Amino acid sequence: MSDKIKPSEVSQVLLEQLKGIQNAEQFDEVGTVLTVSDGVARIYGLRNAEANELLEFENGTMAIVMNLEEDNVGCVLLGTTSGIKEGMVVKRTKRIASIRVNDNMLGRVINPLGQAVDGKGDIDLKDAFEMPLDRKAPGVIYRQPVKEPLQTGLKAVDSMIPIGRGQRELIIGDRQTGKTAIAVDTIINQKSFYEAGKPVYCIYVAIGQKASTVATLVQTLKEHGAMPYTIVVAATAADPAAMQYYAPFAGAAIGEYFRDRGFPALVVYDDLSKQAVAYREVSLILRRPSGREAYPGDVFYLHSRLLERAAKINEQQEVAEQMNDLPACMKGHVKGGGSLTALPIIETQAGDVSAYIPTNVISITDGQIFLESDLFNQGFRPAINVGISVSRVGGSAQIKSMKKVAGTLKIDQAQYRELEAFSKFSSDMDAVTAMTLDRGRKNNQLLIQPQYSPMPVGEQVAILYCGVHGLMREVPIDKVRECQNQFLDKLRSSAPEVIETLAAGKIDDATTQKIEAVMADIAGTYKS
């Protein structure tokens, strides 16, 4: 029997069977926890860990590498420290911190890791794009000048401090001056674009706020029909400092998902003061050297690399496709002409704009809207100090009709304020001065706008034309806003084509004559 078995056949059978064995062994690079405290862990043994890499603890908690030292790695925890003990095993994921994004996120409230926190179940992330949290800003050749307006629906902003798509415009002021209100009104105003099939996707990033405040804001957006095109990224005061630090980066990554696919997007960071405080906390626990006001030396770089990611991308498809630092998943899906507009918010203490973080962000952004407590308390809302508010993009981010009508409004209002200061000391004044003061006061009343009631740009141009050209001379100061409402109601019913023409950026003699005729009828009823 044995003489029938050939050794070559045995070896052949063994080789065939060995080929079928799946070698499923996988080696994970692991380390052990040395110390853990205040949301930071030090880990020994991860010699090949990279900066910003995700690590996974054996209990499922995730962390991000921040410090690379000779004998250990310092990482910030994206969860609670309870359950993490000395000696616990930590493994590398070999993935840089990122967030998975797709259109199913619209209308949802998520945390900086992309997990839903609104109680509506998990988000379907099938075919989602993996967008890195930290990414280089597009280079100069991949950008184009900001030239398209981002309508906020606020007369004071759209006429005097215009914001363009791709711009970074800082909203700065003390607490309780209406900073968030401006950002929320801007988001609500994008509803008409969404309904017209030209959506501006909005991302609202809440950093270090009370969970109840975020819930109220989400409810407000729902009531005004703004949630279908909005994503809320929430890192509340109860979340670890690392989550508050990374929340704006998650917002920017989601914004880039829309921007790189050719859509306009708007991201609101509310507010970066709290992000800087969270970053300071994490840095001090990691024993990084501190600088001015105990902030780490690279706090300027923290905000500059975040805000530089806002851009208007080149229209040329072949140029946009070559964009630097493009995530692998985005290749083949890039479309030129997209934009990411940033509205960072900074809270000042007692109106001090010369503090460390405010001056940093002012120098990074393309202008600022400065809100004042005094104006707010006097009833001028939005409480914008036009004198020191500025948009460095200017008229190139306005439609032609608005530019023509409101081009001198900012200077006129500044002159009015100077004259008003002098008029307090003077008993008699000439007719020109009296007229300038009257027009300035009435324009101030026109620029007052209730919260959550953004105005379409065509209507803005029409009413500002009346204010700038002194068509409301006969109207008493306390009846200006009542007159405005009557004028707009009549214009909508009797000459809707005027509003459409102005919204399209055109203004001609026929249009202005209709505006003057309608206002003359309304103003005539106020003659004493």
Predicted regions mapped to residue ranges:
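Conserved P-loop
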Residues: 180-228, 253, 260
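Loop/turn-to-beta-strand initiation segments
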Residues: 199-201, 228-231, 262-266, 337-342
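P-loop NTPase nucleotide-binding/switch module
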Residues: 88-90, 97, 101-104, 117-167, ...
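Acidic-enriched and Gly/Ser
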Residues: 2-17, 23-26, 32-150
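Conserved catalytic/coupling modules of large nucleotide/cofactor-utilizing molecular machines
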Residues: 274, 281-528
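Flexible beta-alpha connector loops of hexameric P-loop NTPases
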Residues: 144-150, 175, 202-207, 230-247, ...
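Phosphate-binding/switch loop-helix module in NTP-utilizing enzymes
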Residues: 243-279, 331-332
